[in-house]
Amino acid sequence: MLRSLWMLMLSLTLACSDTTGDSAVPPRVPDIFTDGYFIAGHQATALAAIPPVWLAAAKNLKVHLMGRSHSTQVTVGLSRLEADSTNYSCATGWFSLPEEAGTLNIYGAQSGTPYCDFAFYLNNSDGIPGNFTDAQSIHAVLMRAPALSVSVFLWCRDLDSMTSNQVHDYLVQLALLEAQYTNVQFVYATGNADADGAAGHLRARNNRQIRDWVKLGNNRLLFDYEDIITHAWNGSSWIQSTYTLNGTNVPFINPAYNPAVNGPEYEYTHANETGCREVAKAFWFLLARIAGWE
């Protein structure tokens, strides 16, 4: 896996046609990896922009993905993209790593229980007999599945209530993992945009803190889930959904993806099928960049 510093600036505006079920595909400019970081946000969703050679390279990555129900937007979305085209073939194991040739293989550690949180990801057992244990912590997983080359932890609603000190601890812990496992690319992530009111305002602040950390460089990668799920293309421009609290615009899940507005909810993911697809497109884009696409 490439961990070198990609400094090439992309100035080409991509006008592409997508074959994954979207009726209106905008000209999209991929988010740029520069100054030692890359953020996969709402513009990093143009699947047709990924050269076939880098799509194939992305499939060679072995991905560890942990999270609760919101994280299934990635795996469910990936399955829908694969149904559209075998170019996007993927296989997800349940607490195991599949070994399918020519396919993106994902070690899925996902659950609707409260135990797949970041503390669980790090090392902590829930202490409850019969429930998941620290055998699924990132350390234990990497010992059991040393072929893994990428690890992603995705938030549920934790960031709606976390303090800035707790967010800082998350960032420091991931940086320590980066230093400990230099052959694994750890991906930072922002949280979802479901909450409104004071909780949503706090979540947005915490997400900004995560972005600011990633922008410090050191080859950091961010899956900007909040940015992806709050933006939608209206046929001529990107529209971000927000609400206002105390004079501040706060990002909020876009109506195009919100099952409460454009339902139904798709496979218990807290988004509709369109939202799952958009999240999965950005995930492919991110993996292609990790594989070396500039």
What are the language-model segments listed below?
Residues 191-234:
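Substrate-gating cap/lid alpha-helix
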Residues 46-50, 129-142, 165-176, 205-210:
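Alpha-helical scaffolding within the catalytic cores
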Residues 13-32:
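Bacterial Sec-dependent N-terminal signal peptides
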Residues 128-168, 191-194:
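Oxyanion-hole/transition-state-stabilizing segment in secreted/luminal serine hydrolases
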Residues 244-294:
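Histidine-centered active-site loop/cap adjacent to the catalytic His
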Residues 4-15:
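Bacterial N-terminal signal peptides
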Residues 59-63, 87-89, 146-152, 179-187, ...:
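Loop/turn elements at helix/coil->beta-strand transitions in domains of secreted/extracellular proteins
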Residues 32-141, 278, 282-290:
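N-terminal carbohydrate-binding/catalytic regions of secreted carbohydrate-active enzymes
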